[in-house]
Structure formats: structure tokens, C-alpha cells
């Protein structure tokens, strides 16, 4: 892991955006959903502030964190890992075992559905995208002229069991019958 961290730091110091994949892949070189083998977390992307072209609902980090806290309390989810990206937050609930993507999809879609139902304003394209890449803590978000540090904001709870998340998220929905792919306002 130390070697990966040093490499990420080097790329970031040289002006590159640095990301990591959330899934494992069957074959190297293809970051397509069809090439994803397993997933080991549920996650959200919540934007705030002025860097998003007026498409966000939260003005400040504090407002976004407050909405996330309310959502977790209402659903009964544990405190997630939270990474501050300099213009949003990425949240992670690690799972106690890897899931094949077809096992993971219903949980991810149900999490997305609950966010919408409970008015937690997320980037809905992210939550159920098994080929998604997100920012690496310890690097910099360099999308704008202002370099913003990507950092671990809160270390969440230990990995949760898949059974726990199935219970808390409720009956999984069929991803093929649901089209929730655009951000809602």
C-alpha cells in the first residue's frame, strides 16, 4: 500500500488527477461495467458549493454532512467513511465480504432509491456504477484553478455484513426496471 500511496502522491504533485477503481476487474486495461468482477463497498457522491455549475443542492460542506447524518439516522445506517474532495464528499460503507457485481447491484440501486426518496441529493450516476472511479485521499482535486486537498474526513465503522445492509436498505429493487440515472433536483 505504501508504494501505491507514493505513486499517487507523485502523480498528484505533477498536476494529475488521481483516482481509484471501486471494483475488481476480470481483465486488465478495461474499466467497463461488463469487465467488473466484484465489489466490496456501497458508496455515494454528494456535491456542494459553487464548483458544479449550479447543479447541487448543498451550499456548504456542513449542509451536505448534516443531510447525510439525517439520512443515515433515518435509514439506520452506520457512520460511513467520508472523504472530502474539495467540492463534495464521497461516502463509503465497506462490506465484510466481496460481492459479485450481480449480487451488489440490487443493494446499490436500493441505496440510490432511498437517497432519492429521502431527499439526500447525490450524484445518482455514481451509486450503482460498479466501474466508477473516485478520488484518492492525500492527493489534490485540480479541476479548477484552486488546488483542493482530497482528504479522509471521517473514518467510519468496521465493514458491515451484507445481511445487515439488506435488512437496513429493504427489499432490493430490480435494476433493469428502474431508470434513476440522472441527478435529481
Give, region by region, the residue ranges found by the protein language model:
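A glycine-rich phosphate-binding loop feature that marks nucleotide/adenosyl-phosphate handling sites
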Residues: 126-139
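Charge-rich interaction segments
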Residues: 173-179
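Short, glycine/acidic-rich hinge or "gate" loops at secondary-structure transitions
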Residues: 83-87, 123-128
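Helical (often loop-to-helix) elements that flank the catalytic cores of nucleotide-handling enzymes
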Residues: 53-74, 95-122, 142-173
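Single conserved hydrophobic/aromatic residue that forms the stacking wall/gate
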Residues: 180-185
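Flexible loop/turn segments at secondary-structure boundaries
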Residues: 89-90, 143
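Alpha-helix initiation and N-capping motif
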Residues: 4, 65, 130-133, 162
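Signature for HUH/AEP ssDNA processing cores
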Residues: 1-87, 94-110
Amino acid at each position: 500500500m505504501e508504494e501505491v500511496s507514493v505513486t499517487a502522491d507523485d502523480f498528484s504533485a505533477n498536476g494529475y488527477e488521481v483516482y481509484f477503481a471501486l471494483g475488481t476487474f476480470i481483465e486488465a486495461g478495461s474499466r467497463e461495467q461488463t469487465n467488473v468482477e466484484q465489489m466490496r463497498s456501497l458508496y455515494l457522491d454528494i456535491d456542494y458549493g459553487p464548483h458544479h455549475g449550479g447543479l447541487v443542492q448543498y451550499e456548504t460542506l456542513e449542509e451536505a454532512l448534516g443531510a447525510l447524518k439525517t439520512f443515515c439516522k433515518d435509514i439506520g445506517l452506520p457512520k460511513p467513511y467520508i472523504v472530502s474532495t474539495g467540492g463534495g464528499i464521497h461516502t463509503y460503507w465497506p462490506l465484510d465480504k466481496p460481492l459479485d457485481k450481480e449480487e451488489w447491484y440490487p443493494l446499490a440501486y436500493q441505496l440510490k432509491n432511498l437517497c432519492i426518496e429521502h431527499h439526500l441529493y447525490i450524484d445518482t450516476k455514481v451509486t450503482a456504477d460498479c466501474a466508477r472511479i473516485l478520488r484518492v485521499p492525500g492527493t489534490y482535486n485540480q479541476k479548477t484553478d484552486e488546488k483542493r486537498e482530497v482528504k479522509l474526513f471521517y473514518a467510519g465503522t468496521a465493514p458491515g455484513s451484507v445481511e445487515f445492509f439488506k435488512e437496513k436498505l429493504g427489499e432490493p429493487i430490480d435494476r433493469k426496471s428502474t431508470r434513476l440515472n440522472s441527478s435529481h433536483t
